[in-house]
Curated annotation (Swiss-Prot):
Protein family (similarity comment): Belongs to the rolB/rolC family.
Role played: Contributes to the root inducing activity.
Name this protein carries in UniProt: Protein RolB(TR)
Signal peptide: none
Record carries keyword Signal: no
Domain of life assignment: Bacteria
InterPro entries for this protein: Glycosidase
Keywords carried by this UniProt record: Plasmid
Region (Disordered): 248-274
Amino acid sequence: MLHGPKKHSHLSNTMGSRLLIRPYFPPRNLCHSQDATTLLRELQDAFDSYNQSFRGEIMRFQKAFAERVLNMVEARYPVNQLKINAEILTRKVCYHSPAHDPLDLALERQQYLFIYVSCEKIQELLFNRRFLVGTEAAVATSIQPYRSELSRGEMARVHNLAWRRRQTKESDMDCFVAIFSSTLFVSWYEARAVDIYGDEVLCPFLIRQATGDRDYDVVAYGFTKFAENATSRRLPARASSFLDLKLGPPVSATDDEAADGEPTLGPGETRTSA
């Protein structure tokens, strides 16, 4: 999920050294957030920082890129596809290098998503500087990492219900990567988790199919605040309601014409919640 073999699209190869250097958004390191409330507020600040300052920088880059592409004299493929993409890039933020196809674009209704990974995967993220999607699908949820009423074991269980092609362990719930949803994500599965108080919590999952080797902007990363799995200990008092980081319902495959369809179900797989 965080890395894959190096592959380059035909569009990327076409531009070659003529590509402009895309601005880099340094993901916010939230590993030192001491509690769930602090993590919530620091996450909100990180998303606000991307929206308020970096989006303008990205659009300036994309318009310069588009101008360069549209001035190219070649008309054959893949240059003609680059020109089609360039027109789109003058209007919508793209979360990765614009030389890749299909484009993964910002949604009109923003939604914050979280991809849960092990500490080892976070180290790879720090090394790569960006979230690299290669040969595996990216499995994300709108369930936030500060949800301390949910246990690591229960979160691993519902991840395995949502995506049975990869075995998720409790250690994969130790860390999170915060990103924006985008046009290549499709609404996939809604699981029912049970929190440490015995209450049911709906967990929506979204899938972005493997797209070849491309890197994506990461807004923030850090340690989750999910509960330990021991049930014999005395339960903590239920936390007061958190601010909701979700800015809209999960995107469906029909929300944007740029979404490229649902992943294919494997044998015995179902999207009906257990």
